[in-house]
Regions:
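N-terminal glycine/serine-rich phosphate-binding loop of ATP-dependent small-molecule kinases
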Residues: 1-98
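A mobile "lid/hinge" subdomain adjacent to the ATP/sugar-phosphate binding pocket shared
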Residues: 259-303
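Internal helix-turn-beta structural module
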Residues: 301, 305-329, 335-400
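Glycine-rich beta-strand-to-loop/alpha-helix junction loops that act as flexible
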Residues: 9, 92-96, 211, 325, ...
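Glycine-rich phosphate-binding loop of actin/hexokinase-like ATP-binding domains
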Residues: 153-258
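Phosphate/pyrophosphate-binding loops at sites that engage ATP/ADP/AMP, CoA/4′-phosphopantetheine
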Residues: 72-88, 193-200, 315-326
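Short beta-strand-loop/turn "lid" adjacent to the catalytic site in phosphate-handling enzymes
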Residues: 73, 77-125, 146, 153-161
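Catalytic phosphate/nucleotide-handling subdomain of diverse soluble enzymes
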Residues: 221, 226-262, 268, 332-363
Length: 400
């Protein structure tokens, strides 16, 4: 069954085409549409076994972008399917499912209405995610669609971990609480890591660290999300590329009063101007920070130490919450590729039973590999995340 997986952002569409069977999957093509709504847009199409294809032209909206993707998929030279009839379903990544969606679901009018109702608390992502669904209805009418939510995995978090100590009325009226994100990735790498280490996923204590430009840590207790570092929004928790992570709210309101900033300006500051970018005034990319760190830049040293240290703090917190830990898993763009980050986070965790294998860690990039010694009581691993495969699998299981 050929499944198209879409991740629609405000000005981009990431996609994969995967041929799914009961026990196997085969990637046929992947690519990205960028700069939607700007004077010059881009399509970069990468079919497996064929030469990549690029197209540069105005792409005014998501529907136009998806049409270009479908044209590329059926192109005689660059395509991977003969006709669009071969696309049996479309799976969508949706950032926020609120309390409505504890699992993936087939798209209905009610589902679309609930996604729309969450625009207020997910203004950066849900509108674009829904736009992808509506565009498919126009260009592939009648094709089953499935929504897979970043928040679903975290719907098992107990109230003691998801509630804020604010007046309860704000939860009752507005559902202000911790939701967590990156759930699709956390679930996949926890399951895959447990299998790699020979652990029983449903009878284990696993801490997953999804570290990229956005980053979060999750406690997975007996196969279910028990706590996670992101909160009501993805700005909470770790020090990230441009997001501040944990901060005293009074510090933010104080800055707002002093600078005469609106709520929208404060929100933009915390989301887009903070994190390692704000600390260094250099870059939001950890590769740039690493170079500046090696050159002795004091701000880069501070930013990297804060970034790594915050991850280590959450690992310790979640080990305490779960009464121990069996495995720590690293994933995400930085988690999969930064040997320095993994070593730094694990250094000092020997008291918890972590015996980190520095030799195994060297050069481990974009692979699935155990990074702890054979005798380590707590296993450590790096797992390459595959959110698209999870979306394709959920889509296949719902429509087959």
């Amino acid at each position: 069954m050929v499944i198209l997986v879409l991740n629609c952002g405000s000005s981009s569409i990431k996609y994969q085409v995967i041929d799914m069977e009961d026990a196997s999957s085969k990637l046929l093509a992947k690519g990205i549409v960028e700069r939607i709504g700007l004077p010059e847009g881009d399509l970069i199409h990468k079919p497996v076994g064929k030469q990549p294809f690029e197209l540069h032209r105005p792409i005014p909206d998501h529907t136009t972008g998806i049409k270009l993707v479908l044209d590329a998929l059926t192109d005689p030279e660059h395509g991977v399917i003969r006709s669009l009839d071969e696309v049996k379903a479309v799976g969508h990544r949706v950032a926020h499912g609120g309390e409505f969606f504890p699992e993936s679901c087939i798209v209905t009018e009610e589902v679309k209405s609930k996604i729309r109702s969450l625009f207020e608390i997910a203004p950066l992502h849900n509108p674009a995610n829904l736009e992808g669904v509506l565009s498919i209805e126009k260009v592939l009418p009648g094709t089953p669609q499935v929504t897979v939510f970043d928040t679903s995995f975290h719907q098992t978090i107990p109230a003691v971990n998801f509630m804020y100590a604010l007046p309860h009325a704000y939860y009752d009226k507005y559902r202000v609480r911790k939701y967590g994100f990156h759930g699709t990735s956390h679930k996949y790498v926890a399951q895959t890591g447990a299998k790699l280490a020979g652990l029983d996923f449903e009878n284990s204590k696993i801490i997953t660290c999804h570290i990229g430009n956005g980053a979060s840590v999750t406690a997975v207790l007996n196969g279910k999300s028990f706590d996670t570092s992101m909160g009501f929004s993805p700005v909470d928790g770790l020090v990230m590329g441009t997001r501040c992570g944990n901060v005293d709210p009074s510090a933010v309101t104080f800055i707002g009063e002093k600078e005469g900033m609106s709520y929208a300006e404060l929100n933009e500051m915390m989301n887009k101007k903070s994190g390692v970018l704000g600390l260094t005034d250099l870059s939001s990319d950890m590769r740039d920070i690493d170079l500046a760190y090696d050159e002795g830049n004091p701000r880069a040293i501070l930013a990297r130490d804060m970034h790594y240290g915050r991850i280590r703090k959450f690992v310790g917190e979640y080990a305490a919450e779960m009464g121990g830990v069996d495995m720590i898993v690293f994933t995400g763009g930085v988690g999969e590729n930064s040997c320095e980050m993994r070593e730094s986070v694990c250094t000092g965790l020997e008291f918890m039973g972590v015996e980190f294998d520095r030799e195994a860690n060297k050069g481990a990039r974009g692979v699935n590999k155990i990074l702890s010694t054979p005798g380590s009581r707590v296993k450590v691993a790096v797992i390459a995340t595959d959110e698209e495969l999870v979306i394709a699998t959920d889509t296949y299981n719902l429509v087959k």
